[in-house]
Amino acid sequence: MTIQTDGKTDVLWFLPTHGDGRYLGASEGARDVSLPYLRQIAQAADDLGYYGVLLPTGRSCEDSWVVASALAPLTQRLRFLVAVRPGLQEPSMAARMAATLDRISDGRLLINVVTGGDPVELKGDGVFLDHDERYVVTDEFLHIWRGLMAGETVNFEGKHLRSENGRVIFRPVQAPYPPLYFGGSSPAGIEVAAEHCEVYLTWGEPPAGVAEKIAKAREAAERKGKTFSYGIRLHVIVRETESEAWEAADRLISRLDDATIAQAQATLKRQDSVGQSRMMALHGGDRNKLVVSPNLWAGVGLVRGGAGTALVGSADQVADRMKEYIDLGIDRFILSGYPHLEEAYRFAELVFPKLPLRATTGTAPSTARNNGPFGEVIANDIVPTRRVSAH
């Protein structure tokens, strides 16, 4: 399954299930990420024409599958990028969850493959494997998961995972399965992405760093006879003028003190994620070294793991920087801004008219049926056969 690029781009927004507010690292201006608030963001993104929304995963977040299942019936066209977690989930259970959510959303599910990069959190979740061994699990997981979602009866025996006569009876709407997104900067991660996935993701490094990662990912994919689509994860601070945007960036970290930054950086350093290390190297924890490329600001990464950079500037400047990434091969952006409700509107109103956007279209109605109807499954395993009437 290969997604072809056409010189245009999709823009996804972000559901802040781990918290939202006006300032980083402070309770002042914070918001309760209740279901009604998340519904407002999702419905705004749907109405504004965002392609989809990313739901984060991990112990700092509400469960992404439950949230997406709650919001899918409340939206019409919006796609939901939700994580499978090799090592935390069994592939058969993850496949059933994905197939069901794809069906009840009428084909609006996207899959984010997350191996995990924090050994402390992973041990709390029962995963005690080192960095490269976790990617072995991810590879085995995806072999099984993809086969199940494609309708195969899966028999697999790997180093960590086994499946004997595994099946998914209720198939997803999207064939053979929803697109797989994958972000991994290490050689092990890139190889797994090239083997299994359609979209290779990177966090928002300067263009030279993104070009380097794309080149490595493209080479790995070509060795396997595949072609990637490429996405980038960034924050955005856009205003009508550049000076207003930089003032907003300064306000966002205005409640941060040095002790909070030091504590956050020490916690992030325990991760063995190559991508996280690359993010932290951009600023070194120094709030005086945050402009890492034209209109690219690393202030978010002082206290936030994962995506730590933001495009900052006027609408024209932000659009121009995005077009520079598009020229490198990026064809989908996953964006966010604080607070997420207001900034979803602001970005769409100011920047959408300046971007080569693909049209956001819904899927055909009434596609989510049980590949039937055929009645109830017999003995939890056998699909009743359709009898042909004699005439």
Curated annotation (Swiss-Prot):
The cross-references to InterPro entries, in alphabetical order and at most eight, read: Alkanesulphonate_mOase_FMN-dep (IPR019911), Luciferase-like_dom (IPR011251), Luciferase-like_sf (IPR036661), SsuD_RutA_monooxygenase (IPR050172)
This enzyme catalyses: an alkanesulfonate + FMNH2 + O2 = an aldehyde + FMN + sulfite + H2O + 2 H(+)
Q: Which UniProt keywords apply?
A: Flavoprotein, FMN, Monooxygenase, Oxidoreductase
Q: Gene encoding it?
A: ssuD
This protein's source sits in the domain of life called Bacteria
Functional note: Catalyzes the desulfonation of aliphatic sulfonates.
**One Pfam assignment:** Bac_luciferase
Family, per the entry? Answer: Belongs to the SsuD family.
The identity of this protein, by name, is Alkanesulfonate monooxygenase
Q: Which molecular function GO terms apply here?
A: alkanesulfonate monooxygenase activity
EC class of the enzyme, as a word? oxidoreductase
